[in-house]
Amino acid sequence: MLQNEVENFANLLEKATAYLAPFQEKIIVVKYGGNAMINEDLKKLVMQDILLLNQLGVKVVLVHGGGPEISQGVKLLGKEPQFINGLRVTDQDTINVVLQMLTGKVNKSLVALLKGKGVGLCGIDGNMLQCEKLQAEVDYGFVGEIVKVNTQLLDLALNANLIPVISTVGVDEQGVVCNINADTAASEIAMALGAAKLVSMTDIAGLLRDRFDENTLIPEVEVSEVQELINQGIIAGGMIPKIACCTDFINAGGIEANIIDGRVPHAILVSLFGGKNGTLFYKK
């Protein structure tokens, strides 16, 4: 390297180390979904970034969905996927597809990209995600809400310097398998593990003042401001439960939560190393 290249690299490394310091030997939970999961090139970059963080001493837990794959599997059965208020209606055929696609194909494809450092798990394993049937005005079928997270298997994996890769199905007291929202699962797992940071990868730039204009990105939100943003209609629709997961995590003791744009290459590293990506939620 030329002298100026060495100096530039050293400066970059120094800055990265400073940003990373609060998270070394700490747990970061990444909720993985959206375009970064569908685009094969982005998927490889995400897994490379997670491997790098693991090598730098950050304990990463990857929680993933698999909506497009599940919908594809349902269509192969001759059915149309059904959603109410953004939640998938999960009948017996659909929960079978969830088990095949989410805990099988999707989970193992991610583990394979982690080159021996990933360990594939689902919420049924070790009774990790204990749930009960979601109570709502409509019947969503086999959809659950988490009542307890058992971290035993996660603790074992993290202590062995492995990267848990978790598909979001759970089980109730009767042994009935339920589909669980991935954002909710990631938040609950992060709280149970005492994670320092929660990262949610999405297909949008972050929280926008005008949802049709990415130039109106709100880069930071203090959690006490969230209700007013809801009142103003800035936080609306599907962003309300997603941001609620972030605020629940922070109010439970997490340092910060990010909703980041998964369409951006190396989005996780950018958010960790002080770059501008998505919206950061924090508490004063």
For the regions a protein language model found, what residue spans apply to each?
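Nucleotide/pyrophosphate-binding catalytic subdomain
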Residues: 1-263, 283-284
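Short, basic/aromatic-enriched C-terminal tail that caps enzymatic domains
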Residues: 267-284
